[in-house]
Amino acid sequence: MAKKPDTASRIADNKKAAYNYFFEERFEAGLVLEGWEVKSLREGKVQITDGYVVIRNGELFVIGLQINPLGTASTHISPDKQRTKKLLMHKEEIKRLIGKVEQKGYTLVPLNLHWKAGKIKCEIALAKGKAEHDKRDTIKDREGKREVERAMKTNHR
C-alpha cells in the first residue's frame, strides 16, 4: 500500500502563491535557521505569504519570511523576525534556477515550509506572474467547483 503524504508535517503554506503565479517547476531547499526560529516554527508562528526568493552572489535567500519569536525562547538575544534566511540547494540546481530567473517574467516563490527527516525544508517554485484576467479565471473556476460540490451534496440527501 502506498504511503500517504504526511500533512501534519506541514508548518506553513503560501496560499496566495497559487492565485498570483503559474508554477513551472518546484524545488525543495534546506533553510539556515537559528535555534529560536526552529522553536517558533514548531509552534507554527510563521507567516510565509509575503516571502520571496532572491539570488545574491550565486546563493539563494528568502526575504519576507516572518518568524515570530516565542516569549520564552530567546531571552539572551534580541531576535529579528524579518531576518533574511539562506536557502541550501545543490550548486547545479542553483545554476539552473539562475538561468531561468534571468529570463523575463520568472521569479522564485516560497510555497510551503515542512519537516523532512527532522529538518525544516522550504518548497520553492519557479513561477511566472498571472495577469489580472488569469486571476479572474481562477476565481471563476473555484466558484464553479464550489457550485458543483454544493449541487452534488444536495442530490445525495
UniProtKB/Swiss-Prot annotation:
Residues 135-157 are annotated as: Disordered. It is found in: Cytoplasm. InterPro entries: SmpB, SsrA-bd_prot, SsrA-bd_prot_CS. Its main location: cytoplasm. GO terms for biological process: trans-translation. NCBIfam families: PRK05422.1, smpB. PANTHER family: SSRA-BINDING PROTEIN, TMRNA-BINDING COMPONENT OF TRANS-TRANSLATION TAGGING COMPLEX. This is SsrA-binding protein. It comes from Albidiferax ferrireducens (strain ATCC BAA-621 / DSM 15236 / T118). The lineage of its organism: Bacteria, Pseudomonadati, Pseudomonadota, Betaproteobacteria, Burkholderiales.
